[in-house]
Amino acid sequence: MAEEIEVEETEDFHDMDFNDEEPSCSGGAVQARTERFVVKKWVAHAMWGWDVAVDNCAICRNHIMNLCIECQADPNANQDECTVAWGECNHAFHYHCIARWLKTRLVCPLDNKEWVYQKYGR
């Protein structure tokens, strides 16, 4: 199946009309390539994606990018101090929440697999 697709693509490629002729000099005049189209306006669009399936910490139920309940209770807490921790299972929690959870259980709260830090930070 993949071979058929490749053959079709190359056939389409060969049917395209190219102007590969090099400009030649004849009598001191240089032939310029004619443009087939001119881009008058280009509007770029971007999308931001989040690779975590859930937006909330399953332990404290707050949005993962907001402060956890521990940091909300501390008036001196800084947004940078409340980081996100990812496990090898790709589940994400607030670092403070998962650290408190791991004091009593050494498994992920969602899938009950052994918890191993993959990364943590913003």
UniProtKB/Swiss-Prot annotation:
InterPro entries: RING-box_E3_Ubiquitin_Ligase (IPR051031), Znf_RING (IPR001841), Znf_RING/FYVE/PHD (IPR013083), Znf_RING_H2 (IPR024766)
GO CC terms, sorted: Cul3-RING ubiquitin ligase complex; cullin-RING ubiquitin ligase complex; cytoplasm; nucleoplasm; nucleus; SCF ubiquitin ligase complex
Cysteines paired by S-S bonds: none
GO biological process: cell population proliferation; lipid storage; protein neddylation; protein ubiquitination; ubiquitin-dependent protein catabolic process
Subunit structure: Part of a SCF complex consisting of Skpa (SKP1), Cul1, Roc1B and a F-box protein.
PANTHER family in UniProt: RING BOX
Protein name in the entry: RING-box protein 1B
Lineage, broadest ranks: Eukaryota, Metazoa, Ecdysozoa, Arthropoda, Hexapoda
